[in-house]
Amino acid sequence: MKLVVDASVAVKWFFRDRTDESQMDEALNVLSGVATGAIELIQPPHFVAEVSAVLAREAPEHAQRDLRDLQDILFSIRDDAAVYARAMKLAIQLDHHLFDTLYHAVALETPGAVLVTADRRYLAKAKAEDRVCSLTGSRALISGERP
């Protein structure tokens, strides 16, 4: 299965001990699928930078270690012209920040890929679009059920 995860999902992988983080089990389920090879991650070019910015701000004492761990996770990058064009179209259509629409554009431009997000604001705007799934719905998606 091919997934794109945005920073709202990926940062949860590093905040496992936080009691205020919701949907932790779902986020770790995605990470487990990546580790076993059941899930192939395809990401936009700013993925590491965006996640790293949150790690540096929220957990500076562990940020360097967490960055190394993030870089150890296997994923490929999509940064071709079609991705940027689709992201621009989505940003205008949804009146939303391009950095968020880049994740969705990668999913839309990669055959069979789905964006998984914990960003409720983006999900509310993009729910009419194809190939976007809430983190809550990801477990059903990964298991082959309909989210």
What are these regions (language model features)?
Residues 1-43, 55-65, 129-130, 141-145:
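Short, well-structured N-terminal submotif of metal-dependent ribonuclease cores
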Residues 2, 30, 48, 76-77, ...:
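Acidic, PIN/NYN-like endoribonuclease modules and their adjacent C-terminal/linker elements
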Residues 5, 42-43, 78, 98-101, ...:
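Short beta-strand scaffold positions
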Residues 8, 45, 81, 119-120:
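Alpha-helix N-cap/helix-start capping motif
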Residues 10, 50-54, 69, 86:
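A general alpha-helix detector
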Residues 38-39, 96, 110-112:
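Short, high-confidence coil segments that cap the C-terminus of an alpha-helix
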Residues 43-47, 83, 103:
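Short, conserved alpha-helical segments within structured domains
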Residues 65-94, 105:
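Acidic catalytic patch
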